[in-house]
Amino acid sequence: MINKIGVLTSGGDSPGMNAAIRSVVRAGLSEGLEIYGISDGYQGLYQDRMRKLDRYSVSDIINRGGTFLGSARFQEFREEAIRAIALNNMSKYGLGALVVIGGDGSYMGAKLLTEMGLPCIGLPGTIDNDVAGTDYTIGYFTALETVVEAIDRLRDTSTSHQRISIVEVMGRYCGDLTMAAAIAGGCEFIVLPEVEFQPEDLVYEIKASIAQGKKHAIVAITEYICNVFELALYIEKETGRETRATVLGHIQRGGNPVAYDRILASRMGAYSIELLLQGYRGRCVGVQNERLVHHDIADVIQNMKRPFRRDFLETARKLF
């Protein structure tokens, strides 16, 4: 029987992680469990940096961005000897299960620990919205608001100077954040990792819009597709229109979480406690059609593919 549970945040931070931690702690306490917070993700687990949390430990954090437990990337956790030390550290405190909040890399750590005998539940915490098994991840909607606000501001100056603006959005190899922000921000052009991209095709479309009288434009592009500063030089050379690139960077990860992320994180955190008490292990929580679901974490990592929102792309193309 599980009496004590650990909780950690791992990988890149996302707004709403604090709300998820708060939910895990308070839902666990309501079931008579003891909850321990682990600092700086799997690194803290390995370094034995854990502390007992009570309901006051998580007071006034639901509205705060980031993660008060801290987060880190710890590639060494792939090594079985490192994980064995982490498990031994957990046993010192009598921890019988672990809730992991993070992206697919964090899920991999939870999968490996489960295979070594520790029941783990994963919660999807990333602004990239690139985790399979869930419609939305914790932090995605807050990041979306941040990106749209940036696009709105870029539009003001692009209009004033009759300029082409390129805005690079996070997302790794998932275009959800870029696509949704482009629709909400009224971007004229969109470049996604899921769709083949040729710079000359983009230039052709920009020239066509200029020929139709368009004075300015905003191009939304997901990170890692190309060097956006080189792309800006190429567009300016080919079109004769001043072009500037803006990389939003880590500002997208910060800020107070919006209401939906707080609600989503709270629901998922409480659900993780339910699953552990019901005997589940090696599962990850998601929300699909607004209903909480859970999947085998190994299946999510290895087999499940996140569907591309082609309906969003079609909408975007009609409106641009």
From Swiss-Prot:
UniProt catalytic activity: beta-D-fructose 6-phosphate + ATP = beta-D-fructose 1,6-bisphosphate + ADP + H(+)
Compartment(s) of residence: Cytoplasm
Pathway connected to this protein: Carbohydrate degradation; glycolysis; D-glyceraldehyde 3-phosphate and glycerone phosphate from D-glucose: step 3/4
GO cellular component: 6-phosphofructokinase complex
UniProt binding sites for ADP: 22-26, 55-60, 155, 186-188, 214-216
Pfam families per record: PFK
Classification via NCBIfam families: PFKA_ATP, PRK03202.1
HAMAP family: Phosphofructokinase_I_B1
Record protein name field: ATP-dependent 6-phosphofructokinase
Organism ancestry: Bacteria, Pseudomonadati, Pseudomonadota, Gammaproteobacteria, Candidatus Palibaumannia
